[in-house]
Amino acid sequence: MIRELYFPTPVYIADLNEEGLNEQLERDIIAWSNRDKGLTRTNVKGWHSPTNMASLPEYKKLVNLLFEAQRTIYQQEHLDSEAYLGNMWANINPPGAMNRAHIHPNSLWSGVYYVKALPNSGYLKVDDPRAAASISRPKQKEGPTPSRLWREAHFEPKAGRLIMFPAWLTHCVDPNNSNDIRISISFNFLQKGMFIWLKLFTKNYLLIKFHI
């Protein structure tokens, strides 16, 4: 019998090893947080920077790395339009801080890059997007359950790790139970067809394009 899988939820993970990048990012983000009170979005007890991060020259190297990663994803996902890096921001979660469950509307792909993350500093949790699947909870055999049968997934933060996923995927960040701050950078990618809508209805939205 042939088995076919439909409606998958792709999550891309890469561990980047850019010498000196995280040290530079940590220094600049902490300095930014000292001069800007930040925003309140899904963050609880944490600092959320303004969302114009991609336009600041000190973050250009990371922006270029994100473009490279997104180019690969667009090719693998058979997307045939121009891609744009939309808003991008930094997060500082001190011990006890977390982020409530949310999605990223008006975007296509979302992601997070970890600048500093100790063990137990808060997993990224994503939920099964198939709402109808929650009506049944079949009993599973003993042993490891294949990821295609999970109802939620947890991703460990690690300095230098990049995780990218569809913007419609509900996700949250567990509390930071380490004894130090956790620093991450979040961002959203779009397509050319989404540009006009965002320009008309969204304020302070930075758009950067590249060709694939």
Give each language-model segment a name.
Residues 1-80:
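Non-heme Fe(II)/2-oxoglutarate
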Residues 4-6, 82, 103-107, 177-181:
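A generic structural micro-feature
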Residues 19, 118, 131, 169-171, ...:
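Short, solvent-exposed loop/turn segments at secondary-structure junctions
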Residues 29, 126-130, 141, 200-205:
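Short intrinsically disordered coil segments
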Residues 55-86, 94-108, 115-119:
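Active-site region of the double-stranded beta-helix
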Residues 88-90, 111-113, 185-189:
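A structural signal for short, well-ordered beta-strand segments
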Residues 93-164, 195:
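Catalytic core of non-heme Fe(II) oxygenases with the double-stranded beta-helix
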Residues 145-204, 210:
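Catalytic core of Fe(II)/2-oxoglutarate
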